[in-house]
Amino acid sequence: MTLQETIEQIHPLSKEAMDRAKAHWDGIAKPLHSLGKLEDVLIQIAGITGKEEISIEKRALLTFCADNGVVEENVTQSGQEVTATVAENFLQEKATAAILCRSAHADLFPIDIGMARDTKVPRYKVAYGTKNMAKGPAMTREEAVRALETGIAVAEEKIAAGYQLMATGEMGIGNTTTSSAMAAVFLNQPVPELTGRGAGLSSEGLARKIAAIEKAIAINQPDPSDPIVVLAKVGGFDIAGMAGVFLAGAAHGVPVVMDGFISCVAALLAARIAPFAKDYMIASHVSKEPAAHLLLAELGKEAFLHCDMCLGEGTGAIMLFPILDQANAVYRGMATFDEAQIETYVPLT
């Protein structure tokens, strides 16, 4: 579907399915709501899919790989060539995300949405990297829309193949710089308060990063009321691709798990494009990056994991999968009060 067609298919969650899922939880032979957020997230998934029965066995991590022109400003510890190296490691199951996917029984799909050179990673390339946002727009509006629609198309491929749960990941040297820029615009907060050290910058490197972001915002003057303009002016193709996945998941009734800081920026981008889309997103963890908790708060999300992670790739999102499996095992398998011959618990008044 096109971006506009996708937006038009996004509706509120199914209250009927959520009510049935809550009634199912309340009928299980245990204290009411004693599994806390684990109960809430399965009720949310019921609302997303419109079904009381929760099926999340077939799951995928979609990791969007892209390069960012702003690396010209010397804002990263690693060189741009690392993007392609790590992307190819996904295929060889050597990267962190690949190992975690194997452990969590998830399929990993790396996507070249805008790397500076071609690799063996499947190509859905919008361009060979973005332009340097510190000198002008990172991409055109047309490229921004194409990148969003690429994410939508990739997600729809997986949904058509039967995937019931998706997670978003990314790989792209310089993408904490673009993400910090977008976060500063969307949240209307000072750049220094939202910008972290990424993959490990020195204090001097962090100062260059902050200066580059402030310069990019000053030069491009992105309008926070137009999310696609914000993406085009100071964003990245990887962020756009992930946002497309969030939008497609919402349009097709498939839950999508958010990863860390960069994924949260993509989630907020999707929510600014289509507000109901945020109800279809599940937060996994709170990134170590300083803007992470502000982004989650803006989205009205509470994360499960607080591990001071800042690795990216979709690693935190994948770590949530086994937790969801355990919640679903109880939801599906535990005896009801009648089956256990226990008097039904009633809510306190």
Name each region found by the language model:
Residues T2-T349:
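N-terminal loops that bind phosphate or other acidic moieties
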